[in-house]
Amino acid sequence: LSKGFNIIERFSEDIDLAISHSFFGIEKTDKSQREKLRKISRAYIHETLSAQLDANLKEVGVSGYTIENVSQVQDKEGKWRPIDSDKDPTVILLHYPSILEDTINYIPPRVKIEISCLSMDEPTELRQIRSLIGESFDGEDTDADSLARTVVPTRTFLEKLFLLAEEFQKEKPRSVRMSRHLYDLAKLMDTEYGVEALSNRTLYDAIVEHRKAYYALKYVNYDLHAPSTINFTIPESVIGAWQDDYTDMKRFFIYGESLEFEA
């Protein structure tokens, strides 16, 4: 939304990438096939893509970094345990030494790469991507210019609606780094993409069916995603935490005009 379409003015939480499930030769969506797809994808990403990333960085002269294939997660008691082998998305962290004396906990010195094998293939389009340095200074960082196949904002708008609706079906919804989705929706709402998203029932239903088939979250009632019943309003029990998170977002992530939380 920021680099490809210039709709939002904030830093990204991560780099979201997708590998088509057809790449692994799996098309079916039953439970056993989903688990097989996730396991194959995780192994490929951590064993092959991670090594390719390391080799490519070394080839262009980058040094001083470390690559971490994330294989553990911290539970509610603070204990670390192995991530399930069929967990999606798969995460790679690229840690780098910051040139700043003081770092911010909200923005750790790392690049977080999330790669999913469950995403829809369409609709997407090719977009020109430039770095912030390249956009700000003529002739600088031109080597970073590239064409990337990117999800169209119409689909992103709907996926964020469903993501929030699903999150708020949890008994204890998350809040840290989650308010960015509300900011994105607010910025998208009045664009042509937001208008189209709310009028394209075919795409709306296709995304719901895809999420139901490929994610099949046990705590989600996908029937509630119908336009007449979808609810992405922040529950009263966590609204304070979401407001605190948005305060951090405005301070550390949003570099353009920030919207008011209660607007």
What are these regions (language model features)?
Residues 5-10, 21-263:
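Structured mid-to-C-terminal alpha-helical surface segments
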Residues 1:
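Glycine-rich beta-strand-to-loop/alpha-helix junction loops that act as flexible
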